[in-house]
Swiss-Prot record:
Function noted in UniProt: Binds the lower part of the 30S subunit head. Binds mRNA in the 70S ribosome, positioning it for translation.
GO terms assigned for molecular function: mRNA binding; rRNA binding; structural constituent of ribosome
Record note on quaternary structure: Part of the 30S ribosomal subunit. Forms a tight complex with proteins S10 and S14.
GO CC annotation: cytosolic small ribosomal subunit
Residue ranges of every copy of the KH type-2 domain listed in the record: 39-107
Gene designation: rpsC
Name of the featured protein: Small ribosomal subunit protein uS3
Keyword Transcription: no
Sorted UniProt keywords: Ribonucleoprotein, Ribosomal protein, RNA-binding, rRNA-binding
Length: 206
């Protein structure tokens, strides 16, 4: 079971894992869901090169709080905080509520699954060999203190006629152990041969 299910959803409320959207709605659920989708797509489009890991949206009675986890927080904040103010205004226009935007820096981006998967996807789009990109990510992760890592690429690898999946795994990865802190992410690389899916599991040792 632990091998198949999404490791983050499987461990919710364990190891401080939480939902990416923290709010409750009754009648206006659809409207708030569309607002969340807009906020995520707008931030991802505006800060493509800021090393975004995750965006957490929390709603209180009269306040919407957005927390952006990034490996390059300075890119998001901008000169004298101008860029983040622009984001705040754009979101406030959409949700018609007071908005708070916080930026959290990631100290070790080499062991963040979302950043690893997006890095591999970017390299594949630049026609770097998929094996080289995967092995480099694995080495960096283990060097920075990751307990174990598994990386998978699926699609027309290297421009092959028949799509296939290749996996690389190093270190420990206890997917059945619920208290083990497992980070997981999925990303897509849009190459000239088609889409290549990249999946990354990282065992973070406390």
């Amino acid at each position: 079971m632990g091998q198949k299910v999404n490791p983050i959803g499987f461990r919710l409320k364990i190891n401080n894992n939480t939902w990416d959207s923290v709010w409750y709605a009754n009648k206006d659920y659809k409207e708030k869901l569309h607002q969340d989708l807009f906020i995520r797509s707008y931030i991802n489009e505006s800060f493509k090169h800021a090393g975004l890991s995750k965006i957490i949206i929390e709603r209180k009675v009269d306040l919407l709080s957005v927390t952006i986890h990034s490996s390059r927080p300075g890119v998001i904040i901008g000169k004298k905080g101008l860029d983040i103010e622009k984001v705040k205004q754009k979101i406030a226009e959409k949700v018609k509520n007071s908005v708070e935007v916080n930026v959290v820096g990631i100290k070790r981006p080499e062991i963040d699954a979302a950043l690893i998967s997006s890095s591999i996807a970017q390299q594949l789009e630049k026609r770097v060999s998929f094996r080289r990109a995967m092995k480099k990510a694995i080495q960096s992760c283990l060097r920075m203190g990751g307990g174990g890592i598994k990386v998978g690429c699926s699609g027309r690898l290297g421009g092959a006629e028949i799509a296939r999946t290749e996996w690389y795994k190093e270190g420990r990865l206890p997917l059945h152990t619920l208290r083990a802190n497992i980070d997981y992410a999925f990303c897509e690389a849009k190459t000239i041969y088609g889409i290549i899916g990249v999946k990354v599991w990282v065992y973070i040792v406390n």
